[in-house]
Amino acid sequence: KNIKEAKVDDIVAPIVKTSEEAAKTFDKPVELIFIDGAHEYEYVKKDFELWFPKVIDGGIMAFHDTILWEGPNKVVNKYIYKSRYFKNIGTVDSITFAEKTKENKLSDCIQNRYFLFIKKIYQTICIYPRKFLVKVATKCHLIEPLRKCKKKIKKLTKKEK
C-alpha cells in the first residue's frame, strides 16, 4: 500500500522474508538497501554482511535506529563510518545512510571520521542532561560546528530528493 501511494511500485519490490532468506536467493544488483530489523548487534551485523556484497558501487546502504539503539549504532560506526568502502555519509532523524565506493579517498575518510565525531556529540546531547552539555559545548566552541554539520546533512538529503 505505502509503495503504491509513494508511486515507486515500478522500481520497489517488497520481499516478505527474513533478511537471511531473502539474501540467499536475491541475485540482482542492489542500488538501495534499507536495513530495519532486529536491533541486537549480531543481527544488524549479519544484515550488513549479507547485503553489502550485493550493493553496487554508487549504491546506498541505509540503517534505521542508528542513534539511540546500541546494535545499529555499533554497526554503522564500525562498518560505515570507519570503512574505506563508504563515502557521503549522512544522518536523517535516526537513519544513517552512505554511498558504497570501491575505495574512498583520504578526504572521504577524514569527512567520515568528522561526521562520526559530530554524531557522537549529538548522541551525548540526547542521552545526558541537555543544559549541562550545552554549557560545555559553548565553552568548547562546539555549537557552530554542530550547526554547520546539521546544514550539510540537510543539503545532502535535499540533493537526493
Please place each PLM-identified region on the residue numbering:
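S-adenosylmethionine/decaboxylated-SAM
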Residues: 1-161
